Swiss-Prot record:
Comp. bias (Low complexity): 306-329
Biased composition (Polar residues): 331-345
Region (Disordered): 300-348
Protein name in UniProt: Coenzyme F(430) synthetase
GO biological process: methanogenesis
GO molecular function: acid-amino acid ligase activity; ATP binding
Protein's job: Involved in the biosynthesis of the unique nickel-containing tetrapyrrole coenzyme F430, the prosthetic group of methyl-coenzyme M reductase (MCR), which plays a key role in methanogenesis and anaerobic methane oxidation. Catalyzes the activation the g-propionate side chain of 15,17(3)-seco-F430-17(3)-acid (seco-F430) for intramolecular C-C bond formation to yield the carbocyclic F ring of coenzyme F430.
Length: 528
């Protein structure tokens, strides 16, 4: 697509429209930015006008004055400029599509492999685990809701913090990476509600639970199918086997389609269970980590130029070492890696088309069930991208959970279950409470202090107060105290309830209520 000397209207400067407008203006286009939600500060709009030559408006402009309209998939189709554009049969591009076109024109990306991860759940954990796995062999830059990070040899360093996961933020992530002097082998982007069509590997973690977007005129699952429908020819798609809508949409004659299955997902149909290429299983006892020699370096996607392609397994670092032993129970030609004992007693086994590729022992300190999708999706992606199984094992066995994603820790001597993140929703809060109740029973704890709510209604559609009210009515009695976070939560009523402005204040109040044998459960929707 020719992106030169066109008249663009970029709608929604709140959710990633600003970097899109800047990129289009820098390419020699005449750009107008529409602050649809009227949330952008006047000084920011003035800077866009004076420094970048972008005309800004807080009200709709006539669609007839533009060659192309750029709008996010979540924008209400009844917005005047979109209504006019459809009536005039004017082309409307999504933020995802225009970002894809901009990225295609960036020659700096030509030698870098790109992975995009989208879905309802497990995006951040899948992307983060994959970055860890790949970094054992390659240099990786990871962009998620946790920040922009460079990964090398299983360790990360922060490049930049404060970006959202809107498609427009990818443009900023790329610039910040190159400005910092990094030239990675892989970019991994967590992206909300779809894909840009430029990924070498696209990962769809889940499509459920589905929800309405664009003023409830469309489903988020349909928008996420952009990852599938716009996938570039020759790329690979890794899709949750339960996402049948996505499997039907995939152009299998143009892209390679692989599926993965979490066996604990009760939403899978019998048909879906049969077609999965990659499956995660639990192992009742600690077992040897076997890596069949023919699976040590799968072909998958072509590796970045200049990287070694040795198929010989290296000794594992961390909790696993190369034993070099044989066992009659293992398939011929296998190399056995013996797992060191771990106190968790929880093992997983990773299968490809019915054949075991690897198994690993998990560390304690986090809710393993919250990461099942991430374990199987990241492992499948890593195998497809040419990662050695022992690197995958090392990453899994060293994994301690992600902050805000069912990680267990202590705060002032009190047990804390941290479930506060941008993807937290009321269903996640229910599951977290179930887990906390089990932990209370198993560890003979006393009460549960629940911190629940939102830091801002702008965080991924926020947490609807009416759903929180229903949650309190149903589960509030199970908690010793409930601390509701956010201005909108003041409308929620119930027994043993107090209120806090933000997560920090909520946790501070929880510490005041909690005794040494209590559990604090933090489930607040926020950027972290």
């Amino acid at each position: 697509m020719d992106l030169y000397r066109k008249k663009f209207a970029v709608l929604d400067l709140t959710h990633g429209g600003i970097p899109i407008a800047k990129s289009l203006a820098a390419a020699g286009n005449e750009v107008s930015g529409i602050d649809v939600y009227r949330t952008v500060k006047p000084e920011t709009l003035l800077e866009l006008e004076e420094k970048y030559g972008i005309h800004c408006s807080k009200t709709p402009l006539p669609a007839s004055g533009f060659d192309l309209i750029v709008a996010p998939v979540h924008l209400d189709p009844a917005y005047p400029m979109l209504l006019e554009a459809r009536a005039q049969k004017k082309k409307v591009l999504s933020h995802h599509e225009i970002v894809g076109e901009i990225l295609k024109g960036d020659s700096r990306l030509s030698s870098i492999k790109t992975v995009e991860v989208t879905g309802v759940k497990a995006k951040t954990s899948t992307a983060s685990l994959l970055a860890d796995m790949l970094s054992r062999q390659f240099e990786v830059v990871l962009h998620t809701s946790r920040g922009l990070e460079c990964w090398k040899a299983g360790a990360s360093s922060l490049i930049y913090k404060g970006l959202s996961i809107t498609p427009g933020s990818i443009l900023v992530a790329v610039e910040k990476t190159f400005e910092a002097g990094f030239r990675p082998d892989f970019f991994i982007f967590e992206i909300s509600i779809g894909g840009t069509g430029t990924a070498d590997l696209g990962i769809l973690t889940t499509l459920s639970p589905d929800y309405g977007i664009a003023n409830n005129t469309a489903l988020a699952s349909e928008a996420k199918l952009q990852l599938i429908k716009h996938a570039k020819s020759g790329s690979t798609l890794l899709i949750n086997a339960g996402a049948e809508k996505a499997l039907k949409a995939a152009k299998k004659d143009q892209v390679k389609v692989l599926t993965f299955r979490d066996p604990f997902n009760d939403q899978l149909s019998a048909t879906s269970v049969q077609i999965a290429d990659f499956v995660l299983e639990t192992v009742p006892e600690t077992s040897a980590l076997s890596v069949p020699s023919e699976l040590v370096m799968p072909s998958g996607l072509q590796k970045p130029a200049g990287l070694s392609g040795s198929s010989e397994p290296d000794s594992l670092s961390g909790s696993s070492t190369s034993a070099g032993l044989s066992d009659s129970s293992m398939p011929a030609g296998s190399t056995e890696f013996q797992a060191s004992p771990t106190p968790s007693g929880s093992d997983i086994r990773f299968m490809r088309r019915g054949k075991k590729i690897l198994s690993a022992s998990l560390r304690p300190g986090y809710n393993v069930s919250a990461y099942r999708t991430a374990f199987v999706a990241a492992s499948a992606a890593a195998i497809e991208l040419g990662t050695k199984p022992e690197a995958i094992i090392s990453a899994i066995e060293g994994f301690r959970g992600l902050s805000g994603r069912m990680q267990e820790k202590e705060m002032n001597g009190v047990s804390l279950i941290d479930n506060s993140n941008s993807g937290m929703d009321i269903l996640s809060a229910e599951k977290a409470l179930d887990y906390a109740l089990l932990k209370r029973k198993d560890e003979k704890k006393e009460g549960i202090i629940l911190v629940l709510g939102e830091e801002s209604s702008q965080v991924c559609e926020g947490l609807p107060p009416e759903l929180v009210q229903g949650f309190i009515e149903k589960f509030g009695a199970k908690c010793k105290q409930v601390i509701l976070v956010g201005e909108r939560m003041k409308a929620v009523n119930g027994k043993n309830i107090s209120y806090a402005r933000d997560l920090t204040e909520g946790l501070s109040k929880a510490s005041e209520f909690a005794g040494g044998d209590d559990i604090i459960l933090s489930s607040v929707k926020c950027f972290r």
